[in-house]
Amino acid sequence: MLSTEDFDFDLPEELIAQTPLKDRASSRLLVVNKETGDMEDKHFHDILDELQPGDALVMNNTRVLPARLYGEKPETGGHLEVLLLTNTEGDTWETLIKPAKRAKVGTEIQFGDGRLKAVVKEELEHGGRIIEFKYDGIFLEILESLGEMPLPPYIKERLDDPDRYQTVYAEENGSAAAPTAGLHFTKELLEEIKAKGVHLVYLTLHVGLGTFRPVSVDNIEEHHMHSEFYRLTEEAAKQLNEVRQAGGRIVAVGTTSIRTLETIGTKFNGEIQADSGWTDIFITPGYQFKVVEAFSTNFHLPKSTLVMLVSAFAGKDLTLAAYQHAIEEKYRFFSFGDAMFIK
């Protein structure tokens, strides 16, 4: 049995990146070879050397919504903070509301000048709330004007430019957090990668807050992931199958791309097919990868499901050794931090 403690490490607080670097691609890149255990310190732009003509680089094109709203109860003036998690249907959303005790079923909330209103419809087991919005106009436009970017709890500084918490290829609205491994790519770097003969392929997974939810059980097998919506189009599936048939590698950018590809690979016995749905796949050591052959990812929180996923691919000992190396070399950690490439 693997315990949550097996994935713990001491991280000096000053290594938690609070702001993005001026140039996206100037972050550092720790390249780890899982077969030999070799590690190389590089810069992110050097990912170009790690990709081979004929490979597919698979990226998550989800876009982060300004999903944090500040509202009040019209009858009392009491303030509430609402974080949108998942659009369940129509104008109905799963949310987290603070303070939760003020948000009973039937509670009305208004935002801004009242052009956006909501009513609490249901209380969920884990403390979340289902709410239904009422408004005139286009919901996303109202959200853009009233909402704030929901930065992770470990980032204490305000973000000057909200676009820095979006990838340059973000297109599909729906995430409560950025797929941060993609934040390092610039449009120029993607053009260089394409010019090398690498196929750029996009899928969608809308990142929920399960990403930041700590593992609260000791035996990791008892942890349940939050479900997240994913989609792989016919066109993307066709590209990936062509790459596979020609002997190229499937290289994923980030844990969200990995979880989407492996959800599909698990569902279709190792084959890649167009698909969409909800996934709660939890990848831990012992899992046999069916699609992904190499990937880039940021440095994650101790004891997190993301460190467990990296350990499933590279092995727990090598993963923790790579993290120790990154700490000694003062790599920057978490959402705005540096990256690793594992092959």
UniProtKB/Swiss-Prot annotation:
Q: Name one GO cellular component term.
A: cytoplasm
Q: Where in the cell is it found?
A: Cytoplasm
**Its Enzyme Commission number?**
2.4.99.17
Q: Which reaction does it catalyse?
A: 7-aminomethyl-7-carbaguanosine(34) in tRNA + S-adenosyl-L-methionine = epoxyqueuosine(34) in tRNA + adenine + L-methionine + 2 H(+)
Identify the keywords attached in UniProt to this record, alphabetized: Cytoplasm, Queuosine biosynthesis, S-adenosyl-L-methionine, Transferase
Main localization (coarse): cytoplasm
Domain of life assignment: Bacteria
One matching Pfam family is Queuosine_synth
- GO BP terms: queuosine biosynthetic process; tRNA wobble guanine modification
UniProt pathway annotation: tRNA modification; tRNA-queuosine biosynthesis
Q: Enumerate the InterPro entries for this protein.
A: QueA, QueA_dom1, QueA_dom2, QueA_sf
GO function terms (MF aspect): S-adenosylmethionine:tRNA ribosyltransferase-isomerase activity
**Oligomer and partners:** Monomer.
Q: Which HAMAP family match?
A: QueA
What is this protein for, i.e. what is its function? Transfers and isomerizes the ribose moiety from AdoMet to the 7-aminomethyl group of 7-deazaguanine (preQ1-tRNA) to give epoxyqueuosine (oQ-tRNA).
Q: Which family does it belong to?
A: Belongs to the QueA family.
The name under which this protein is listed is S-adenosylmethionine:tRNA ribosyltransferase-isomerase
Which species is the source of this protein? Enterococcus faecalis (strain ATCC 700802 / V583)
Identify the coding gene.
queA
